[in-house]
């Protein structure tokens, strides 16, 4: 298949770029799920739900956005791409509005699709205006206690640091509230002008981060069996969103000129080992 051939070629490049990757790193993997965004309109409800649970009380990290549901202004498929759009507007007629002056969308596969281990790839073009905070990430399907339940950030970008892509894991032992989070970064100079493949290879032994087939960070399971250090042996779901402001995204302020801000996504694909 075309995708399988492309994956093999990509992984060969990644293996060359990151010596710790074996050339046959994905032997035995096959595509198990994808969204190619071929049908215009709202995102496919068989694949994506809207996370709006904290609108009334306010979102984490002192963020400024209201996450809307079923609103094409904030999430839609057009021209073969998923568009997530953050806008400068107040939706105060909605019953769960919490006083926010920006709108956006937070799409999740929670309750629909989740995976334990695999190779994850999202092809995206991201916004770069000051105050924007786009993210492609994963949480435990049955998360009740963050960070104990774990978090995998496939891609994060803050608009005041243009082109610097972050890949991070959060656990009880390793997280930003303690200053112990484990992550890496890579500069992608045209991240806001061109599409790139943001990738994670997650196995029982390691979580590896890459962009366009080039690996740049690895978090390894130390084998201790301590879930505070490695909570990554259970199903996780995907999340796509643009946050506005917040402790990190708004560290240098929020410029109204940054909005509307779009993250455009050409595909989301998941491969898993079949043996």
Language model segments and positions:
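Bacterial N-terminal signal peptides
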Residues: 8-17
């Amino acid at each position: 298949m075309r995708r399988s051939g492309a994956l093999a070629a990509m992984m060969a490049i990644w293996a060359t770029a990151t010596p710790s990757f074996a050339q046959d790193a994905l032997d035995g993997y096959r595509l198990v799920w994808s969204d190619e965004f071929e049908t215009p309109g709202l995102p496919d409800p068989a694949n994506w739900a809207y996370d709006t649970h904290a609108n009334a009380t306010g979102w984490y990290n002192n963020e400024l956005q209201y996450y809307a549901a079923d609103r094409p202004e904030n999430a839609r498929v057009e021209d073969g791409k998923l568009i997530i759009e953050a806008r400068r507007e107040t939706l105060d007629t909605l019953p769960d509005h919490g006083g926010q002056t920006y709108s956006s969308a937070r799409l999740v596969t929670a309750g629909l699709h989740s995976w334990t281990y695999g190779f994850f790839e999202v092809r995206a073009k991201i916004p770069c205006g000051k105050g924007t905070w786009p993210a492609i990430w994963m949480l435990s399907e049955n998360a009740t206690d963050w960070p104990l339940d774990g978090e995998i950030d496939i891609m994060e970008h803050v608009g005041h640091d243009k082109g610097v892509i972050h890949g991070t894991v959060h656990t009880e032992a390793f997280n930003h509230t303690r200053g112990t989070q484990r992550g890496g970064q890579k500069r992608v100079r045209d991240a806001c002008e061109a599409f790139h493949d943001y990738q994670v290879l997650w196995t029982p032994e390691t979580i590896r981060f890459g962009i366009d087939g080039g690996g740049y960070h690895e978090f390894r399971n130390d084998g201790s069996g301590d879930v505070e250090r490695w909570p990554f042996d259970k199903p996780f779901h995907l999340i796509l969103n643009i946050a506005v402001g917040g402790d990190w995204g708004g560290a240098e302020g929020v410029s109204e000129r940054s909005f509307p801000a779009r993250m455009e996504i050409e595909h989301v694909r998941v491969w898993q080992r079949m043996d």
